[in-house]
């Protein structure tokens, strides 16, 4: 029997009303699956829609944004059909998020243990003494020494604050964890420690993780599957092995060429000319066409369909061959 995904995003589209009144198409037709115990990496340049995708799934979009199409199925229940009260019951208990920039996400005037305990008590999961024990368990799990749990965020290093954010996200024992650029602004050694911690916690708790990053090294380290985003759309998706060893979309290919390869340290790194499209001025055809080194005439006028190029591997490119992906 085929395993059902824990999270299934289908044809998700999001529009923004910009400050000048123009409509911006932040996401269009985004689809992917996330399975229990596995990590999906959402990869792409800044502004491609990665964080917007997470916020749409959790229904935490700003007031000037709206979901215009699609489904977000969590355990086969469409989250977009829930009332706000029902959705509040789902957040933190079923799915949680490690926000980018722990210093900004943590309350600067509350001790770390107070913040984690408050999250538990707000969701009526335990009484005060039970919540306090739970805080101790979480801090031990993420590697924060007992003598430091009562300190304030500014007393922590960047890596320690990130560990505290992970503990806070796990406070209500979710099954699905979103991690939005969890290693940003951390040095290489601390990045490795945070990634190892996420992997260890995932193995212990059986979590599904959606990891947002622009760092292909992070993806190679921890992800089972990858969705490469560009201009608010999924350009290519598949297992991490197939994406790295056999990229089908020109954008993915260029991204990988721009990443250092230790097997050929003297090789030149590729660059992608131009800039990503603005959400208010998207190309009529393929979003990547203005920057693509392999474009053909049809790319400028017609958006490519998402094709299944091999089992579990799909790409939206006119140069690819295969049946239309069944999403």
Regions found by a protein language model. Give the residues of each.
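Short catalytic/signature loops enriched in Gly
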Residues: 3-5, 149, 237-327
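ABC transporter nucleotide-binding domains
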Residues: 1-246, 315, 321-327
């Amino acid at each position: 029997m085929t395993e059902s995904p824990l999270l299934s995003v289908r044809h998700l589209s999001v529009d923004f009303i910009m400050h000048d009144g123009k409509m911006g198409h932040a996401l269009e037709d985004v689809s992917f699956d996330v399975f229990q115990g596995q990590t999906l990496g959402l990869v792409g340049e800044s502004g491609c829609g990665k964080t917007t995708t997470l916020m749409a799934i959790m229904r935490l979009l700003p007031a000037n944004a709206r979901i215009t199409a699609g489904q977000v199925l969590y355990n086969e229940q469409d989250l977009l059909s829930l009332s706000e009260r029902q959705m509040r019951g789902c957040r933190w208990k079923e799915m949680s998020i490690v926000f980018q920039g722990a210093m900004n996400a943590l309350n600067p005037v509350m001790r770390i243990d107070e913040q984690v305990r408050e999250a538990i008590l707000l969701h009526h999961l335990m009484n005060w003494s039970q919540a306090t024990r739970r805080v101790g368990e979480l801090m031990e799990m993420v590697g924060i020494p007992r003598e430091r749990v009562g300190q304030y965020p500014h007393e922590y290093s960047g890596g320690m604050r990130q560990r505290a954010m992970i503990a806070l996200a796990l406070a209500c024992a979710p099954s699905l964890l979103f991690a939005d650029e969890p290693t940003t602004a951390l040095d290489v050694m601390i990045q490795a420690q945070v990634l190892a911690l996420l992997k260890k916690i995932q193995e212990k708790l059986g979590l599904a993780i959606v990891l947002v990053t622009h760092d292909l090294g992070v993806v190679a380290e921890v992800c089972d599957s990858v969705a490469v985003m560009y201009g608010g759309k999924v350009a290519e998706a598949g297992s991490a092995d197939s994406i790295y060893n056999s990229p089908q979309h020109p954008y993915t290919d260029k991204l990988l060429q721009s990443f250092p390869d230790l097997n050929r340290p003297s090789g030149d790194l590729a660059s992608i000319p131009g800039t990503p499209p603005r959400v208010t001025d998207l190309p009529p055809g393929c979003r990547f066409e203005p920057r693509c080194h392999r474009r053909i005439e049809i790319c400028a006028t017609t958006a490519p369909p998402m094709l299944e190029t091999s089992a579990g591997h799909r790409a939206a490119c006119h140069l690819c061959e295969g049946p239309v992906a069944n999403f």
